Amino acid sequence: MLTFEDVKNNAAIRTYIQRADESLIARGFTEHSYAHVTVVAETAGYILETLGYPERTVEVAKIAGYLHDIGNLVNRIDHSQSGAVMAFRILDNLDCDPEEIATIVTAIGNHDEGTGQPVNAVAAALILADKSDVRRSRVRNQDLSSFDIHDRVNYSVKKSQLKINEEHTLIKLKLSVDTKYGSVMDYFEIFMQRMILCRKAAEKLGLQFKLMINEQQLI
């Protein structure tokens, strides 16, 4: 069976992730390289493992997380759909089980807030993992005077935590924000759609979604 480690160590996949990120660098986007996809993979796995999903489902979620942004190699627009098609070809060539390919492709094709929906548990975990990866280290632009709103919001986040409570009824995204660089309103201006999708994803997993910024509950 194909494992997460197999995918992480695949030279072709690493090339696609690197080149996709290079395209986003050219367009001024935040980091979407190995750091981001690894965080997303591990977080998606954490969510399903914590909720008691089978070990293989957890592994499939991690694979989906690692591959979820390769569509940026084609174009940022519709990257979830192009990424799903790329993932299908890659996984098929690696003799991945068709049932697992179907789950991974569906999750990748539904992870973006523009058209995505948490259609299965892996898709839901991927959405929550991806949208919660907000952090200062993703900002590449070091000239604070030229920051756009995306730079300001990501740079302002000193710490980000996504945790499920012990009762497995609640998933909470806690952000520590330095308002010197970005306001809470800035966050909502660019992330409102993402937070709505996170709420839907949490509900798919039988959870409530809560957002806390600087210890204040906002959702």
Which residue ranges define each predicted feature?
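N-terminal low-complexity, intrinsically disordered segments
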Residues: 2, 28-51
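Short alpha-helical hairpin
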Residues: 4-22
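Electropositive phosphate-/nucleotide-binding environments in soluble metabolic enzymes
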Residues: 14, 34, 38, 192
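Amphipathic, well-packed alpha-helical segments that form the structural scaffold of globular domains
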Residues: 21, 41-45, 88
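Short hinge/gating elements
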Residues: 21-30, 181-184
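Divalent metal-dependent catalytic cores for phosphoryl transfer on phosphate-bearing substrates
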Residues: 25-26, 36, 49-164
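Non-transmembrane, amphipathic alpha-helical segments
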Residues: 29-32, 117, 190
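Terminal helices and disordered tails flanking the catalytic cores of nucleotide-processing hydrolases
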Residues: 133-219
